């Protein structure tokens, strides 16, 4: 039996969109680029061959379109892990919950999420404007404890 999500657990707007992002399930691609600043959504989407839809609500801005024939959504998260938590939960709900019946879909869809952003740096050999690709990240806010057990392999201390 599928899990049911009460109105208090999953707020769906009158137009069938999720509460914060204002996206409807059909507007979300399986591949999502996350950016912090809402202004960067248009910058990234300017590389799309075609724009299918654009939705804005507060600090959340999304554009879905195609790039090299692949359907992609660019979604802003705003600032902080609390906003990222809201965004990722609503993106997952859009793909894995039937908004008409408020139940889990029988087949789970795993989204591909790629975060593009900026950060400060402390290393002299890495001047401003340098492109950096992280393999891992570490958070000291404790949010990961709600999603993965402490023994999760990718979260273990990295020895240098």
Feature annotation, model-predicted:
Residues 2-89, 100:
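N-terminal short beta-loop-beta anion/metal-coordinating cradle
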Residues 10-14, 96, 149-151:
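Extended interaction regions within the primary functional domain
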Residues 36, 116, 157:
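Single, functionally critical "micro-switch" positions that shape active/binding sites
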Residues 62-63, 93-94, 154:
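Juxtamembrane/interface motifs at transmembrane-helix termini
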Residues 64, 142-149:
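Short, charged, surface-exposed secondary-structure boundary motifs
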Residues 88-145:
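Hydrophobic alpha-helical segments and helix pairs
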Residues 153-160:
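Conserved small/polar residues in nucleotide/adenosyl-binding loops
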């Amino acid at each position: 039996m599928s899990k049911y999500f009460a109105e208090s657990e999953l707020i769906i707007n009158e137009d069938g969109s999720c509460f914060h992002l204002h996206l409807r399930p059909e507007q979300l691609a399986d591949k999502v680029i996350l950016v912090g600043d809402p202004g960067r959504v248009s910058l990234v989407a300017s590389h799309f061959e075609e724009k299918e839809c654009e939705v804005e609500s507060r600090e959340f801005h999304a554009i879905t379109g195609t790039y090299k024939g692949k359907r992609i959504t660019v979604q802003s998260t705003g600032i902080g892990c609390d906003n990222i938590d809201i965004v990722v939960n609503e993106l997952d709900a859009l793909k894995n919950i039937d908004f008409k019946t408020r139940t889990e879909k029988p087949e789970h869809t795993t989204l591909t999420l790629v975060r593009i952003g900026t950060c400060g740096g402390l290393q002299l050999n890495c001047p401003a404007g340098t492109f950096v690709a992280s393999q891992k990240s570490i958070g000291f806010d404790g949010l990961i404890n709600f999603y993965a057990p402490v023994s999760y392999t990718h979260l273990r201390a990295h020895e240098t």
